[in-house]
């Protein structure tokens, strides 16, 4: 059977999908994809997989794809990051029997992508990208697709898209932000760029960016002429977005937990999803946020979900008619709704330099100066000191800089003291080292 291409691929293999769930690291796992499909998603992507690791590590393949699919999870596109044509194709060949297409990630703007030379940081290397797409197009039995970010210039973005199409890309997802637009500096995605790409290419185009509700989906399709719309953050905060519904936050959480019992995933994924779903409620009920951060089993998570449901129902019962939601929210905290990322503060480093670091999730805490992992540990161990300025100071070894022994006669650490004692045939009672002859 000949490989489907372009619009035939979109209409037949993908069923003319218009509502698409984005590839999200540690977030678009099988259980979440199944939940999204129950509520209107017509196509899903796997989380981004590293092609090089996928090729060399059988356990990575098993855990991240082979055991993370099921018959109901179709159509499905597997996404890879790569910067070597042969490695990309080898990984794709190992994955193609489990999906309907292979996607090359050309949109990740994070610093880890810059260090690894993949994602949006390949967008200037057109010769390399042509070779990667062409080789995949020639050797795979399924189509190859791409997810890109735009350039500031519309005409360069159009030429970029046309280059990928000419190389063999059969479907293009365009995120209407540049690689510099991320975190607090994300701003608004440019549908004008997406519209220009759609007019200039002869393959299906999906739009990504500024999608918070079903009305945004419909408006985006109408304004840009794209074949479908991809949602990431909007989907995480309301998996029923494509249905045009805004259910109670515990309703979708309980449904998701039921799916996880059938299709297990790491508890960290579950916790991250619930932090998103319950974002606004956890601002009201801080204790539940701390409990969610500490639980170590799925049943513990379910107990927190039940407690949250009871708290929300009590809030609903106390709600007076005609009172508006607090903090200018579009709905009360117990209703699934979009999260509006705050912009940079006036005079902040991000605002003045144009550079931004990935923002910590607000639900993880607001202790400045701590890493994301430290924040998680702080929530689990509230009495432990994580501030480096409050930790005890140790005098340093005169030679290597490690902490010295408090009773060492040479002011050295154990290792340096032992070497000196052997060299000089000397004693150090502090390190219980006696070498001087009696």
Swiss-Prot record:
Cross-referenced SUPFAM superfamilies: FMN-linked oxidoreductases
Basic residues biased stretches: 373-383
Annotated disulfide bonds: none
Keyword NAD: yes
Organism, scientific name: Rattus norvegicus
Enzyme active site: 108
Family: Belongs to the Dus family. Dus1 subfamily.
Matches recorded under Gene3D superfamilies: Aldolase class I (3.20.20.70)
Region of interest (Disordered), residue spans: 343-387
Any one cellular-component term (Gene Ontology): nucleus
Alphabetized CDD domains for the sequence: DUS_like_FMN
Protein name per UniProt: tRNA-dihydrouridine(16/17) synthase [NAD(P)(+)]-like
Domain of life: Eukaryota
Binding site for FMN: 23-25, 79, 147, 175, 208-210, 232-233
EC supergroup of this enzyme: oxidoreductase
Catalytic activity, reaction form: 5,6-dihydrouridine(16) in tRNA + NADP(+) = uridine(16) in tRNA + NADPH + H(+); 5,6-dihydrouridine(16) in tRNA + NAD(+) = uridine(16) in tRNA + NADH + H(+); 5,6-dihydrouridine(17) in tRNA + NAD(+) = uridine(17) in tRNA + NADH + H(+); 5,6-dihydrouridine(17) in tRNA + NADP(+) = uridine(17) in tRNA + NADPH + H(+)
Cofactor: FMN
One Pfam family it belongs to: Dus
Claim: tRNA processing is one of the keywords in the record: yes
EC number(s) on file: 1.3.1.88
């Amino acid at each position: 059977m000949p490989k489907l291409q372009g619009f035939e691929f979109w209409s037949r293999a993908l069923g003319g999908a218009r509502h698409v769930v984005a590839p999200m690291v540690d977030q678009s796992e099988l259980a979440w994809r199944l939940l999204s499909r129950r509520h209107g998603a017509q196509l899903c992507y796997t989380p981004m997989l590293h092609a090089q690791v996928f090729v060399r590590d059988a356990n990575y393949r098993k855990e991240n794809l082979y055991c993370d699919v099921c018959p109901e999870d179709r159509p499905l596109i597997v996404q890879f990051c790569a910067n070597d044509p042969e490695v990309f194709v080898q990984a794709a060949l190992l994955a193609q029997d489990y999906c309907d297409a292979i996607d090359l990630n050309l949109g990740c703007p994070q610093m880890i992508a810059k260090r690894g030379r993949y994602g949006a940081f390949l967008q200037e290397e057109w010769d390399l990208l042509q070779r990667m797409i062409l080789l995949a197009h020639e050797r795979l039995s399924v189509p190859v697709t791409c997810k890109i970010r735009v350039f500031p210039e519309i005409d360069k973005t159009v030429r970029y898209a046309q280059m990928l199409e000419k190389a063999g890309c059969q479907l293009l997802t365009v995120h209407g932000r540049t690689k510099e637009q991320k975190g607090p500096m994300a701003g608004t995605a440019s549908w004008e760029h997406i519209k220009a790409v759609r007019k200039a290419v002869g393959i299906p185009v999906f739009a990504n960016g500024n999608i918070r509700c079903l009305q945004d989906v419909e408006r985006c399709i109408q304004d840009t002429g794209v074949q479908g719309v991809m949602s990431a953050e909007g989907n995480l905060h309301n998996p029923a977005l494509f249905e045009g519904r805004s259910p109670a936050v515990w309703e979708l959480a309980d449904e998701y937990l039921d799916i996880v019992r059938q299709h297990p995933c790491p508890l960290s994924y579950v916790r991250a999803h619930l932090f998103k779903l319950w974002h606004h409620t956890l601002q009201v009920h801080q204790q539940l946020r701390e409990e969610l951060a500490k639980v170590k089993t799925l049943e513990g998570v379910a107990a927190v979900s039940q407690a949250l449901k009871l708290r929300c129902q009590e809030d609903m019962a106390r709600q007076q008619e005609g009172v508006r939601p607090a903090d200018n929210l579009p709905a009360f905290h117990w209703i699934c709704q979009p999260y509006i990322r705050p912009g940079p503060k006036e005079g902040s480093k991000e605002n003045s330099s144009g550079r931004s670091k990935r923002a910590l999730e607000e639900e993880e805490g607001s202790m400045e100066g701590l890493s994301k992992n430290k924040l998680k540990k702080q929530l689990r161990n509230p009495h432990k000191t994580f501030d480096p300025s409050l930790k005890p100071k140790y005098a340093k070894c005169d030679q290597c800089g490690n902490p010295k022994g408090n009773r060492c006669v040479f002011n050295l650490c154990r290792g340096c003291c032992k070497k000196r004692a052997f060299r000089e045939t000397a004693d150090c009672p502090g390190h219980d080292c006696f070498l001087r002859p009696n």
